[in-house]
């Protein structure tokens, strides 16, 4: 069964010119890029995307980071796309929790600036895809 997930290449990944490397890893895994856009994230979209973190101590810095530069947003499809992308992304802490060979372990150093976001469940994927790609 084909599944869809939202993948974001965050401002640090775009700024460091890692978009091609990251998209290549997604495609080499066997996943399909069904939609792809370079976006400027405004405060409203950032707040809606990270609504679950509102009230947490890091919420402000999270919003500041995601709005600090362009983001590549993608709808990624394939069998078990959510789990497959999260596997190649690696743990959120790129130094202590990400497995070598993953995007974060190989290319990132700081937890907040960890290059990519991927939906964590089918429900999150549906909500996030609707936010970033309305009507898709």
UniProtKB/Swiss-Prot annotation:
| SMART domains linked | NDK
Recorded GO cellular component terms are:
cytoplasm
Q: Give the GO terms filed under biological process for this record.
A: CTP biosynthetic process; GTP biosynthetic process; UTP biosynthetic process
Q: Identify the EC number(s).
A: 2.7.4.6
Gene3D superfamilies xref list: Nucleoside diphosphate kinase-like domain
The EC category is transferase
* Binding-site list for ATP: 10, 58, 86, 92, 104, 114
The record's keywords, sorted A to Z, are: ATP-binding, Cytoplasm, Kinase, Magnesium, Metal-binding, Nucleotide metabolism, Nucleotide-binding, Phosphoprotein, Transferase
Which InterPro entries has this protein been placed in? Answer: NDK-like_dom, NDK-like_dom_sf, Nucleoside_diP_kinase, Nucleoside_diP_kinase_AS
Q: Which reaction does it catalyse?
A: a 2'-deoxyribonucleoside 5'-diphosphate + ATP = a 2'-deoxyribonucleoside 5'-triphosphate + ADP; a ribonucleoside 5'-diphosphate + ATP = a ribonucleoside 5'-triphosphate + ADP
Main localization, broad class = cytoplasm
> Catalytic residues?
117
Which Pfam families does the protein's record reference?
NDK
Record keywords: Chaperone included? no
Does the keyword Cytoplasm feature in the UniProt annotation? yes
What is the required cofactor set for this protein?
A: Mg(2+)
Q: Where found? A: Cytoplasm
Highest taxon of the lineage: Bacteria
Q: What does this protein do?
A: Major role in the synthesis of nucleoside triphosphates other than ATP. The ATP gamma phosphate is transferred to the NDP beta phosphate via a ping-pong mechanism, using a phosphorylated active-site intermediate.
Q: Which family does it belong to?
A: Belongs to the NDK family.
Assembly description: Homotetramer.
- Listed HAMAP family: NDP_kinase (MF_00451)
Write the protein's name: Nucleoside diphosphate kinase
């Amino acid at each position: 069964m084909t599944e869809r997930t939202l993948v974001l290449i965050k401002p640090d990944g775009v700024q460091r010119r890692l978009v091609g490397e990251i998209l290549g890893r997604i495609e080499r895994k066997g996943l399909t890029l069904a939609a792809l856009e370079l976006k400027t994230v405004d405060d409203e979209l950032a707040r809606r995307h990270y609504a679950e973190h509102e009230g947490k101590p890091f919420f402000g810095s999270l919003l500041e980071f995601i709005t600090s530069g362009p983001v590549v947003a993608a709808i990624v499809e394939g069998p078990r796309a959510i789990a497959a992308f999260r596997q190649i992304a690696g743990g959120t802490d790129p130094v202590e929790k990400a497995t070598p060979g993953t995007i974060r372990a190989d290319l990132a150093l700081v937890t907040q600036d960890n290059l990519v976001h991927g939906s964590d469940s089918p429900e999150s994927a549906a909500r996030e895809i609707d936010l970033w790609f309305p009507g898709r």
